[in-house]
Amino acid sequence: MFRESDNTIAPSNQDLNKPVVDKEQPAERTPFFVDKNAPHNEVDFARIESAVREILEAVGEDPDRDGLLETPERVARMYAEMFAGLKSDPGRHLAKVFAEDYDEIVLVRDISFCSMCEHHLLPFTGKAHIAYLPSGKVVGLSKLARVVEEVARRPQVQERLTHTVANLIEDRLSARGVAVVVESTHSCMTMRGIRKPGSLCLTSAMRGAFKTDPKSRAEVLGLINRAAS
């Protein structure tokens, strides 16, 4: 029933030669290098750099010493990269789909990501597991990972990230069922405050059959738990 590799469980007869929708341009790769001089860049680098200098001075540091001289610029580039998903539409990665007479679970597991907690602006990192029940069309498996990557690049809480990914897949693929399980470690719990390294936050979002049918829910959670073990 399934073709299984290191990262996916998917239909073995998936035919990528029968496009149903291909009206948009090929999806762009999520940028990891940020050009602060690019005319389309909406990040105010100067304001971030000024704010970082203020923070350094406020904690008693000298922002003009050798080790910190370029830190404000580095931090500005980092924020531009980490928050690149704010102005983008991650759903565009799901625009191209393929006709496929397959109605069982498609699961992509262990999609690594890094996002930023909106409460302390500290990173949380982990893995997402995505499953869906197709309704006559499937999407390229890598596109699910691109959705996670792009949704992650914004300040947020893990709960919102989980629901955003689930809603996108349900809406854009008209999936009969969607399950998204996210597990991550939060820096705001491990390096400050309660300081509990190793603690793990687990969130889930169920849609369609995975939410309403106990048997379908149990099946997909069993596959995800096997994948995560």
From Swiss-Prot:
GO MF terms here are: GTP binding; GTP cyclohydrolase I activity; zinc ion binding
- Name the segments for region: Disordered: 1-31
Q: Where is the composition biased (Polar residues)?
A: 7-16
Record-annotated residues binding Zn(2+)? Answer: C117, H120, C188
Q: Which GO terms describe its biological process?
A: one-carbon metabolic process; tetrahydrobiopterin biosynthetic process; tetrahydrofolate biosynthetic process
Q: Which InterPro entries match?
A: GTP-CH-I_C/QueF, GTP-CH-I_N, GTP_CycHdrlase_I, GTP_CycHdrlase_I_CS, GTP_CycHdrlase_I_dom
One Pfam family assigned to this protein is GTP_cyclohydroI
The record's keywords, sorted A to Z, are: GTP-binding, Hydrolase, Metal-binding, Nucleotide-binding, One-carbon metabolism, Zinc
Q: What class of enzyme is it?
A: hydrolase
User: What pathway annotation does it carry?
Assistant: Cofactor biosynthesis; 7,8-dihydroneopterin triphosphate biosynthesis; 7,8-dihydroneopterin triphosphate from GTP: step 1/1
Family the entry assigns: Belongs to the GTP cyclohydrolase I family.
The name of this protein is GTP cyclohydrolase 1
Q: What is the originating organism of this protein?
A: Rhodopirellula baltica (strain DSM 10527 / NCIMB 13988 / SH1)
